[in-house]
C-alpha cells in the first residue's frame, strides 16, 4: 500500500483509459469505431494534446506531411473502416493499422509524452486516429449525406444501439457515452472543435435519443419551412395564482425560507386555441408546432389539446406542464411535454425540469407578489427534483430539438455540457418569467448556445407574467419571446394589443460542418433560422370540429424507443435502395430478431410488435423492388402510398415511417461529403483563418 503523501506512479495512456473505461487498450476496440473515438478523445482531452492540431510544436507540422493528402486519407479510411466493421473480413485500412500500431506500442509510456509532445509521432497518430474514428461515426446519428453504400448495416446497428442504451459505444454508459454530433461551432479551441460527427460525455446525465417521423402528410419535399404558433398564456396571471405551500416556512440560521406553488385560477381555453388556429391557418397553409410557456397546461388537459391540434393538422406540441401531487406530502410536477403526431398516434416525450425557481425580495417586488408571498422569506418553487436527463428528438432532414425549462437554461452543468457537445438544431425553452429582453438573463444564455455549438434558441414566457413584471421606475413590456440565430442578432418578439398569439415562421437549410484538425468542411449539417413574425388575433368563430377525446386514450402501437428503432431500419432500407439495392436482403437479415450482432452488442431482441413492424416494412420494400420500376426509391414511395390507404393501424404506421425515410433520402442532393474535393490545396488551420465577429453585447 502506498503511503499517504508519497509520489504516485507516472500515469500512462493505458492507466488513464483503465481508470475511465475499466478496460484495456487492445485490438478488440477496433471492432467498433465509436469505441476508438472514445479512447482517442479521452486521451487527447486528458493530456491536452488536442491543442497540437491547433498549434503544433516548433519542430513539427500538422496535418502531417508523411500522410499524403491527409484530409482525404482520413475520410477514406473512415469509410473503409465502417464497411469492414460490418463483417470484419480482411484487413483494416492501412492508415488505421499504421497509426494504431504507433499508439499500441506507446500505451505504457509516460503520459507526459503526450502532454508535452515529447513523442510527436504518438501525438500525430492519436490525432489521426481520432479523425478517422470521427469519420467512421458519420451517419450513426443523423443519417444525412454522410450515408453512403459503405457500412449501411454498421450504421443501423449503431443507431439501434443508441436508441437502446443512449450511447454509440459498447463501453458501459455509466462510465462514458459517445453521442452523435449535430452542429459544430465555427470557432473554439477545445477538444470539441476536433470532431463533427461524434462527441464523448462523462457519466451523470441520462440521455434518450428519439427519432420520430413527424413531417405532415402531403408536405412538398422542397418545403423547408416550419410555422410555430406561440401562445404566451396565461394572458393574465393573478397574485393569488402564487400560493405558499402550507406549513413550509422554516428558519435556517438567520435565513427564512419556504415553498410556493403556481396554480393558475383558470384552465386552458380550448375554444380560444381552436379560434387561434383558425386565424393562423388563414395566414399560412399549415402550423407545424404549437408552443406554450412553462406550467401553462395541466397534465389532464394534454389529451384534449392534442386531439384539437390533430384536427387542424398540427404535428408538434411543446408546452410546459404542471401536475398536482399524487399523494399527500409530495411536491407538484413541472416538466416540458413534447408531443409528436406520427399520423397514427401521438408520441409523448417528457423533459424534466432540474432546477427550482427561487424568488427573493427583489423579485417579489418586481412581480408584485408581496400580498401572497412575504418579501422577507426566500421562496423556493415546490417541485420534485428528478434525476438529470436529456431528451433529444430527431424530427427529420437532420433537424433535432431539445427543450429546457426556465432555470435549466441558466445552469452551467452536465446537461449544458451535453447540449454544447451534441449541438441540437434548436433549443426551445418555455419560461415563467418576465419580458424576454435582449438585456436580461435568458438572452445572455441563449447567446451562449447560439455561439457554441450554434443552435437556434427560442424562449417563450406568459404575457400575464410579462405584465406583472414592473421593476421600480420601469414600464411594463410586451416582449414575450426571444429568438436567437447562430451568428446573428437577437429578435425580441412582442405581443401586440388585441393579439393572443404569434406566428413565427422559420426555415431549415444546409449548414457547414467544420473541424479544427485540418479536414475539409462539408455541407451536410442543418440550421434553422427565423423568417417572419405575424400577430394572431383569434377568429370570431371556431372550426366547428369536435376535439374532446371520447373515452380513454388508446395505448400507442409502439413506444418511443420502438418507434425510434423502426425509423432507424427505415433509414437503412432507404440507404440500401439509394446506394446498393443488392444489399437489401443482407440488411433484412440483420433486422431479424435472432440476428447475432445484437447479442454481440448486448442488445435485447425486438418485441413482438416491433419485429412485426420491421418485417412488414421489408416486405413492402421487397414488393416494390419486384415491380421492376426505376429508380427503387420512387418504386417504394408509390407502393407505400397504395398500401397506406385503408390498412390497419400498425401497417399504416409502418408505411408512413418508411415513406418518410425514403422521401428524405430521395430529396437529398450530392454534397461535398459524398464527392471529396479534388484540389491539391492543403486545408487552412484555424489559426490562419480571419477572426470571427464578436457577439454583439
State each model region's role.
Residues 5-132, 140, 302-319, 329, ...:
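CN hydrolase (nitrilase-like) catalytic-core segments centered on the catalytic cysteine
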Residues 28-31, 39-46, 53, 63-80, ...:
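Long, compositionally biased intrinsically disordered regions
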Residues 52-236, 240-256, 293:
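Long, charge-dense tracts
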Residues 196-221, 329-422:
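Active-site catalytic loop in hydrolytic enzyme cores
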Residues 219-272, 360, 365, 374-391, ...:
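Short, compositionally biased "basic patch" segments
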Residues 231-234, 288-289, 294-296, 316, 399-401, 404-408, 425-426, 430-433:
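Structural motif
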Residues 267-354, 442-447, 451, 600-612, ...:
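Cys-nucleophile CN-hydrolase/nitrilase-fold catalytic domain and related Cys-dependent amidase chemistry
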